[in-house]
Amino acid sequence: MEAFEISDFKEHAKKKSMWAGALNKVTISGLMGVFTEDEDLMALPIHRDHCPALLKIFDEIIVNATDHERACHSKTKKVTYIKISFDKGVFSCENDGPGIPIAKHEQASLIAKRDVYVPEVASCHFLAGTNINKAKDCIKGGTNGVGLKLAMVHSQWAILTTADGAQKYVQHINQRLDIIEPPTITPSREMFTRIELMPVYQELGYAEPLSETEQADLSAWIYLRACQCAAYVGKGTTIYYNDKPCRTGSVMALAKMYTLLSAPNSTIHTATIKADAKPYSLHPLQVAAVVSPKFKKFEHVSVINGVNCVKGEHVTFLKKTINEMVVKKFQQTIKDKNRKTTLRDSCSNIFIVIVGSIPGIEWTGQRKDELSIAENVFKTHYSIPSSFLTSMTKSIVDILLQSISKKDNHKQVDVDKYTRARNAGGKRAQDCMLLAAEGDSALSLLRTGLTLGKSNPSGPSFDFCGMISLGGVIMNACKKVTNITTDSGETIMVRNEQLTNNKVLQGIVQVLGLDFNCHYKTQEERAKLRYGCIVACVDQDLDGCGKILGLLLAYFHLFWPQLIIHGFVKRLLTPLIRVYEKGKTVPVEFYYEQEFDAWAKKQTSLANHTVKYYKGLAAHDTHEVKSMFKHFDNMVYTFTLDDSAKELFHIYFGGESELRKRELCTGVVPLTETQTQSIHSVRRIPCSLHLQVDTKAYKLDAIERQIPNFLDGMTRARRKILAGGVKCFASNNRERKVFQFGGYVADHMFYHHGDMSLNTSIIKAAQYYPGSSHLYPVFIGIGSFGSRHLGGKDAGSPRYISVQLASEFIKTMFPAEDSWLLPYVFEDGQRAEPEYYVPVLPLAIMEYGANPSEGWKYTTWARQLEDILALVRAYVDKNNPKHELLHYAIKHKITILPLRPSNYNFKGHLKRFGQYYYSYGTYVISEQRNIITITELPLRVPTVAYIESIKKSSNRMTFIEEIIDYSSSETIEILVKLKPNSLNRIMEEFKCTEEQDSIENFLRLRNCLHSHLNFVKPKGGIIEFNTYYEILYAWLPYRRELYQKRLMREHAVLKLRIIMETAIVRYINESAELNLSHYEDEKEASRILSEHGFPPLNQTLIISPEFASIEELNQKALQGCYTYILSLQARELLIAAKTRRVEKIKKMQARLDKVEQLLQESPFPGASVWLEEIDAVEKAIIKGRNTQWKFH
């Protein structure tokens, strides 16, 4: 009776595993097998979707029968048969052996107030069952003791019959348990149990009565389960279906049933898997593995504890073990020791059947057919026989080796955006070339060139040229392979799924007819390719040459280096620059900028020349394309593989970031004129040269786009935006839409990386909210620019929001006088943005930032403005009491004065433990309401991201009932409602430490302000700083030097202007005597002026020196003419005009004297100017903060 004790329903119902499958129909996959009937094979297909709850009804009763068979296995009276039948919708399951005890159940009778017997309790009462509480060594398939009850609930009628050797018990249950008729009990010596029932088909989505198809489908499914049970119970018990014995009394027979039709003549390997410790050792598993090339993916049938198990750790364990063995065996089997072979899923040709019992498992999933147990149980206790693994592995490897076959070079290939050469793959295949275009626009150019026809009969055409698109990007294959080295030193290269499925690279493989298992060392091997070479046709920019072409070369070097050695990989080198001289139609063409620079230096002037850049293939017009394709062969350059190339490929495209970082710490060494001449003379490009110049330039450019320069704290994009903003808003600072301003920047600053990226950068430059990257925005945002809630990701569309330049801040932080002294980036031969700014204050340590690039991490936490001002002023002002102390600290590279993290706009706390600072959010506890109110989050933690991180933490959510966010963009108010009696438990589980209290630990209200101070250097490459002081110390000399340069330049300009104005005043005084109007031409007048000692001057340079250096001013300003005098108009000779010039000279002289004083001041020239500009910046920042950076 104890086995049928009635339990508490509430506790029972809490178990998720007790609930049945879904009532709606779903696709039941994998339910197909075959069986032998009079020596014929018959298929059992499933034609339609079925209701899991209905299948569960049948399954629960079948599992009950197999559980009973296992329970009686060691008893005197065993179960010798299980009879399952299904006819006209009526399901029946009968087994012999001890029946259900026929005795009155006192507890149930008392509750029901009538006589209730144990069979009724077992089949009709949800609060009782033998499987509710199971021991750890239990191998029953039943889970919660409710399976039979659920079957009764979903049945129109059911008949329960059981005999215990003394009595026979028959009871009718109707109307889904609504009517339980009194049982009929009669004397009997029989021992058996039978369940018959008719499910409520109509309510489960079936016809009533069942249609022929439904009857056939359900019969097939039940028969399969009967066959599975036959394999599970073994030979001692016979399983009948519709009175015919099932012939699958072993795991081998069950495996044959599933695979004979789909994979005849396949090899079947069987084994017994034993465990080394109880209770697992008492129940070995039977395994059969069917290996066949017919199978295209791993499949399994698993009957554990009588349940048809669709998933489980036992399958994972077996699959992993097989995979390891196959990989090892495959490596040992390949004869060619240098062959690079790829392996896909090593289990894709296996169908595995597992039958047996596993103690102590749990059943999960909606249908309770997913086995759950710790995977280490199998690793620790179970061992698979080596003979089984060896024989099966050999079969699998044989199939894998057979699948490595040569590709048919003459077959048609179906690849997107591919046009086949007419002779490709034929007798003249080696005369064909595949043109690999960077993108669609390049394809268009190639098509134009290849279809010139009669106008270029000797040029390339589709007869011998095919073309394919690279799609604008190529995957880095070097990072998508795993090299496996065997004990014998053999290397096997395994491509991952991403690389295997990459359409672009697989398209190239198919089009060329490449074989991953061929080296192409011999001409015979290369002759089997569909083309004689591949020609990369990419843009002449960094993305095209440095990235896409580099990745294509790396792909061939990785798998087929011999093809590069034998000249198979080439490139189309198109003109980068064309110079059109006035009056001439044939331009001078240059393929490298170094060639153009060398040529330009030899020219006296480029005034009569038009210089046009062609970085994109699409820039060439039809006429230029025709001209190029007339000399097509001369533009095709072959790559060569030199000794150093292998290492460089590994550095730039491999997975070892430390090697790449060391290489990228230095800038690119440009090609010399000699190198370019050598390349043109032989039309060959060493791979190492391409990698050291083009690929390295691309990598460094990528770094500069992602990591800021330490001098200005800006990436290249932000620098372009600032330079564009200064230029765009110079005359009128009216607001402009973000997308309009983005178009201006792209046009005037030559931004080539897409509108979306540029607009995002503009929006970020104007964002100003607690936690935003920029504490000092260079633009004023008008509209919704994002909030703290989503970390700025909720900004409005660039079409609807506008920006203005934060001119008051920009003018003081970036003085206009500096702009003439900075080095500039030249794009397409035109001046764009500065290579770097050197602001009045070290902006690099004044703002937040985080970004990875090429193995480096860049993370900065803004420092306190007051500390920065104090340090810079102490450096500049010799009268500052800390001046000498700071210079001592800089000299000896030590830290003395504080440089703390900024707490501006942050209401939390900053604390230092050891070498790191930590930021802490704040909270208030209301014990009465059982609520914790978070009033501030750690620095730079967006609200939504924070709440999501808490919700994902299961050990925290066990204490939390609800999280409600009432935060605004400026303030934090997050209510964390706790479950009853949780506060004390939180204090116990989340310990209080010196660094954080229990609530801070529990709510994750602390983050570490750990920094990665990696910045771009002024001349390219990366510099790694250890402290913020080092950044400041490195920046100070650059800013200091700028003042000296500025003053020296101003001094030179003032002197030249004074000379010019003095000469003009002298001429006005002597004009009557000179009387130049009497001379016939300018040449004669100039001679007279020269004889009278007037200096020839370059008036244009003196009036508008702009970007001229001091050296240029001193050299060219005095090498001019007398236009500054001869162009004077009559009114400029009047006494009033002369008086104004004399006053102007006096002012310039006074300023010159002041500049000379500033050049002589200590501690360095321009120190007082720097102090004044620091004061101006401070005032602008205070005003900006007080006005939310609106400045009004």
Curated annotation (Swiss-Prot):
Record-listed E.C. numbers: 5.6.2.2
Pfam families: DNA_topoisoIV, TOPRIM_C
SMART domains assigned to the protein according to its UniProt record, in alphabetical order: TOP2c, TOP4c
Record domain Topo IIA-type catalytic: where: 707-1174
Family recorded in the similarity comment: Belongs to the type II topoisomerase family.
InterPro entries: DNA_Topoisomerase_II (IPR050634), HATPase_C_sf (IPR036890), Ribosomal_Su5_D2-typ_SF (IPR020568), Ribsml_uS5_D2-typ_fold_subgr (IPR014721), Topo_IIA (IPR001241), Topo_IIA-like_dom_sf (IPR013760), Topo_IIA_A/C_ab (IPR013758), Topo_IIA_A_a_sf (IPR013757)
Organism of derivation: African swine fever virus (isolate Tick/South Africa/Pretoriuskop Pr4/1996)
Top-level EC class: isomerase
Subcellular location: Host cytoplasm
Role, per record: Type II topoisomerase. Processively relaxes supercoiled DNA. Displays DNA-supercoiling activity only when associated with the viral histone-like protein.
Name listed for the protein in its UniProt record: DNA topoisomerase 2
